[in-house]
């Protein structure tokens, strides 16, 4: 995210009442302007905050929310450190969404950003709170964001870009560039498939030439049996499996059943695929080995080099 993010659509309304209820059991110190609470209740609230933030930040691998929640009593000159930890951001949630309550943030000496909405900002920024009605309270907690490594970004339509990543986390499709080791049963060097989290495969291209028909296979094994082997009635001759029970694209704990497979339909989607193909064509130095074994005597071994590009497209 940028150094400041303003939440102006009531994103935290679902937990605002929980914070108000927690406030009722807080014993205020009349000297200090804030008090920090950490309990089972705050852990639950922190989990809720984390889920809300995951919906706001699409390119994030991990979000941590401190279980220490600070209730702030208004002090218009309070720009001191609220929490002592290594997390990079403050999140401010107003218990009462009155417009007279403001957070003032100073990105530079000459610039001030004023907001009466819930707000998240870098701890490196100077800030203070401003309000004339001292009975209003707010909540602050610390946030840590870890972003997914991104290879690049590709335009998906006029208003949206898709991050191309080498991380499975937070993504739902994998574009696999598959190179086959030489074998007498295979007359094909390279093909590319899109694999969803159920393991279904959309055959995209061979030799980097895109198919015009969208053919969905239930698994990569089915592609091998139905498409790449130079034999008729292959299924009657042998069956294939990976001895380790691995999927070609996903760790087993990332697999999900019942997913629909993304199929390109619009010009924008086909253009996106073409751009993805071009990037993969010139950026395939990193690969994993994937092995399928046929139950022949002796066994037949097929070895594939697989370069993986993970993306997240909303298509359900």
Swiss-Prot record:
InterPro entries: Poxvirus_C4/C10
UniProt keyword Cell cycle present: no
Cysteines paired by S-S bonds: none
Triggers of expression: Expressed in the early phase of the viral replicative cycle.
Keywords: Early protein, Host cytoplasm, Host nucleus
One Pfam entry name: Pox_C4_C10
GO cellular component, one term: host cell nucleus
Compartment(s) where it occurs, according to its Swiss-Prot or TrEMBL record: Host cytoplasm; Host nucleus
Signal peptide: none
Principal location class: host cell
Function per UniProt: Plays a role in the inhibition of host NF-kappa-B activation. Mechanistically, blocks the subunit p65/RELA translocation into the host nucleus.
Family per record: Belongs to the poxviridae OPG031 family.
Protein name, UniProt field: protein OPG031
Species the sequence originates in: Monkeypox virus
